[in-house]
Amino acid sequence: MGRRPRGPGSPRGPGPPRPGPGLPPLLLVLALAAHGGCAAPAPRAEDLSLGVEWLSRFGYLPPADPASGQLQTQEELSKAITAMQQFGGLETTGILDEATLALMKTPRCSLPDLPPGAQSRRKRQTPPPTKWSKRNLSWRVRTFPRDSPLGRDTVRALMYYALKVWSDITPLNFHEVAGNAADIQIDFSKADHNDGYPFDGPGGTVAHAFFPGDHHTAGDTHFDDDEPWTFRSSDAHGMDLFAVAVHEFGHAIGLSHVAAPSSIMQPYYQGPVGDPLRYGLPYEDRVRVWQLYGVRESVSPTAQLDTPEPEEPPLLPEPPNNRSSTPPQKDVPHRCTAHFDAVAQIRGEAFFFKGKYFWRLTRDRHLVSLQPAQMHRFWRGLPLHLDSVDAVYERTSDHKIVFFKGDRYWVFKDNNVEEGYPRPVSDFSLPPGGIDAVFSWAHNDRTYFFKDQLYWRYDDHTRRMDPGYPAQGPLWRGVPSMLDDAMRWSDGASYFFRGQEYWKVLDGELEAAPGYPQSTARDWLVCGEPLADAEDVGPGPQGRSGAQDGLAVCSCTSDAHRLALPSLLLLTPLLWGL
């Protein structure tokens, strides 16, 4: 995979496919050897048997059957080999030469290259593609590799980013969930795992995924647990999990194999594709997935494919000793009952901070996880003894992130602290004692600091406090003067938080919108009524909630139709280049 896995949605590893109950060996040898004639040395009987089994497995010959197998002709076999060579970018000789046999032994996806029945049609017609009828899809890693240097958090992070490759350019949204109701179930299995596509040990086929549809396996993606899965490894014998996963998830959303050598959907594994945080699909794959689902609003089909990269691109961190990142339950604040220390929009996503933890929402207001992530492990450079923050915001002047605690502040580029911090808040001409909230108002591109009933207005571009401040609040009618948090959001509105409620102020307005305050927990943190179609996971403290596989689970809903999610991957950082 790495470029093109096969099969029911999965790439395969190195090694030849096993011979199956195909054509009678003697007839195979006679048919294929006769085709070689004097032009080339006759292939070995073993290669002939494996070759025909391979051609049948991947769609170039009808399924092997002793009754019909005897009717195979030299011409049909030659055509099948020629089609395979064309698809694989080889010279079309029509015989099992060394290059053809070598390609057959290349690690690849389990799915066939040609649709069922294509061999019997005079004009090969691709059946209509299958696709998901909904745009919000859930996923879950149900089983993990047993003997792998990759920890669970790394595996989940790689799955997240492999799916993100497809959702970045289409209207599809992927959400990790706990429980058995996920649309895309991900497993690491060995040998026969009861889906009709048994794995074959190290090498051979390495993974597969099932196309969308009404069947119970639709979207499910399986990886061979006997493969040496790697990530950012110099080991040439390893199988890059991210590259294979991108290919397989292409199948899971409806894409079949293609012959284009640069496509990720080519069936053969071609090695790593690069950093998950920066990888972009080849143009051929973009066009094909756009034909299925259309283009995401934020993406232009004619946009330049190579987008500028940040000077210091973020890295996917390695897991600490492969331990679970789920914090001890006694330390975790509950998102549905807590009021928050700070709320901020960062790179278009919302962050809710409480104690040493934070929750994160995507641009579409989908909660990434029901469990919080640990602040110190994500924002590298915050003091380990820091037990909370007072306020956080992203500067509009340079898009750096500023954290406030007491009379000190820290500046981060992406998730790494800048040198020379912390510094005193007096740099902002603020009095000692800290602030309660901060946000940048889109209406005038000014930053507002709040403390008790006072507020200050600051120009981030000139790094100066505007004259005449502090002023007595509130500035916006209907919004309380003493705030816990404030945030500018991607819809252009500003949001103000106090206790467990929030107020919305439309861009340019000076009073709260009608109907506010509303519940922060319900509208932002997925603490409403259970989803009508959600799996009942049993009673719990907040609606229908409980625990599964050691993870907190909650089936809740909001006006954004959010899905239940398990604990956040601490190794799934933001893609800061958004």
From Swiss-Prot:
Statement: the UniProt record of this protein carries the keyword tRNA processing: no
CDD domains reported for this sequence: HX, ZnMc_MMP
GO cellular component: extracellular matrix; extracellular region; plasma membrane; side of membrane
Binding site residues for Zn(2+): C109, H247, H251, H257
Short motif (Cysteine switch): ranges: 107-114
Lyase found in the keyword field: no
Domain notes: The conserved cysteine present in the cysteine-switch motif binds the catalytic zinc ion, thus inhibiting the enzyme. The dissociation of the cysteine from the zinc ion upon the activation-peptide release activates the enzyme.
Protein name: Matrix metalloproteinase-17
Phylogenetic classification of the source organism: Eukaryota, Metazoa, Chordata, Craniata, Vertebrata
